[in-house]
Structure formats: structure tokens, C-alpha cells
Amino acid sequence: MARGQARAAERQANNGLGKEIEKKLWAAADKLRGSMDAAEYKHVVLGLIFLKYISDAFEARREQLLAEADEGADPEDPDEYRSENVFWVPPEARWSHLLGSAKLPSIGKTVDAAMDAIERENESLRDVLPKGYSRPSLPAVQLGRLVDEVSNIGLHEERHRKLDLLGRVYEYFLGQFASAEGKKGGEFYTPASVVRVLVEMLAPYRGRVYDPCCGSGGMFVQSERFVEEHSHRIGDPARRGQPGDISIFGQESNRTTWNLARMNLALRGIDANLGRQNADTFHNDLHRDLKADYILANPPFNISDWGGERLRDDWRWQFGAPPVGNANYA
């Protein structure tokens, strides 16, 4: 009884810490509301969170390598980081460099240069990260304050990793931005409660998981969480073919949202095939030969202009062609 109460108390304390951090970051981000709309500053904030997290992870790994230098470890070798699923962060992209420039009028250009450097050094992030931090509509003073606020949180600290802090902040911001954007926000975000129910209903222990309209990747994140809660880890070679061995496949038509998903999964170390480009599943199926074991999706409902007249003889309509004027049954 005492042990259960202690665990409950710890969960409550962690939940309080997580909410405190979420609200603090949101308050800082919300100061940008007057200079740009939610659709724009969403990428400003999420990009900074991404940059802070990979920089923290890099520095943690760097400290390990410095401690092991006498044993042959090389803290300047990018492969020493990539072998541990840590992104290599060049000096001009490290958070300490950004923080040192936060009060300068050129902070926007500094952040843009950091994003470019990260993409150059990490092939999996090529053309993924947001740019435009030096745009006139983003005041340098407000951007600098946001950098300061993000700096106060060690996104790679042990206690924050246990909280899945990055995931919580990312999901919280996606939800907040979706609310701010109204109906349009539903295009990239499905409420976490809905995602959790869908995943727990299907219980994807093993096999291929597919989302044909994956948005920002919430279904995949929750699938990983489900597997981990059952004591396994996605991508563990030792469990290939066993419970816990699942593969992720997805597709997204909106390029901006597709990049959000790639960032979301990259931060969590989830290996996924989201196609070589963003594409409409109806008219450019990038996984035509995929035999999925689980299909999880929250498709865009009540779309009338989906080009159904061009797909009347599509091979996928094995149970009858859907109405041309409504994609709900497609």
C-alpha cells in the first residue's frame, strides 16, 4: 500500500512539474502572438525546442566521451555520437552559442545558420528544420526572450527524460497551436486522448503500423509508448520478430506537417518510413506494396474536393467505390 501511494505521489509531482514547464514555455511563446499568427509561430517555437533538445543530448554525450578520452574516445568524431543515436551538432549550432547571441539584433540570423548547419551535418534532417527566424515579422527582442526561456529547461536532464518532457512539451504545443488555429489545426493534430484510445484498442505489439494521413506523427509516438509500457523498445534488434518489434510507415500530404512529423519522430529516436516526400495518399500512394498489420488513422473528414472522380477504377476499392463528393468512405 505504502509503495503504491509513493508511486502515485511521484506521478503527481512529475505531472505538476511537467505542467509547470509547459505553461512557462507557452507563456513565452504567446508573447509572439501579436507579431504573427499561430500557424507561423508554431514553427518558431517547435524549432527552438528541437534545437535545444539535440544540443543538450549532444553535450551529454560529449561529456561522456571526454571522460573516456584516455580509453580512445574522440569527442570530435561525429560517428561517436551517431552510434548512440545522438545528432552531431557543429559549434555554430550549439545552444551555448545561441544563448550567447540572444541579446543581439542578429539572433534571427544566428538561429537560421544553426538550422542550416544541423541539416548539413545530419542527412536525416535535410530540408526538415524550420527557417525564417530573421524575418521582419519576428522581432529580435522577443525571439531572444524566447531563447532565454527555453534555456532555463534542461531538456536532456535525467528527471526530464523520465517525464518524457520533450514529448510532453511538443504534444502540448501542438495541441495549443491546433486550438489557436481552429479547424485548420485539426489537419496536423489529433488530441492525445483520441490517439491513446485508438492505439490501445489495436494493441500493436508486433508488425507493421501504417498511418496514411499521419499529421505530426502522434499515432506513431503513442504506438512507441504502448510498446515501451509493455517493457519493449521499438527498433531493438534483439527482439526482431518478437513482441515489441514494430515497424512504422506513414504518409502526409502537407509538406510543413510532414516535416513536423519527421522532427517529432527524430527527437524520440523512432525509425520510420514516411516516404521520400510529402504526398497525397489518394493520388500518390508511396507505400503501394506495403502489407500493414495495423492501420491507425484520423482522416480528414467531410472533404468534398478530393479528386474522387479520377479514382473511380482504383484497385483499392475492393468493397465498392466511395462517393465522389465525400471522402469519408475512401
Regions found by a protein language model. Name each.
Residues 1-206, 273-286:
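Non-catalytic, mostly N-terminal accessory regions of nucleic-acid modification and defense proteins
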Residues 11, 136, 159, 213, ...:
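Hydrophobic alpha-helical scaffolding
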Residues 26, 88, 95, 258, ...:
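A residue-identity detector for tryptophan
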Residues 29, 91, 98, 261, ...:
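Enriched - but not universal
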Residues 176-179, 311-316:
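Gly-rich Lys/Arg/Thr-decorated short loops/hinges at beta-loop-alpha junctions or inter-strand turns
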Residues 180, 243-244, 317-318:
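A short, mixed-charge helix-start or loop-turn motif at secondary-structure junctions
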Residues 184-297, 302-313:
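Conserved S-adenosyl-L-methionine
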Residues 315-330:
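Glycine-rich S-adenosyl-L-methionine
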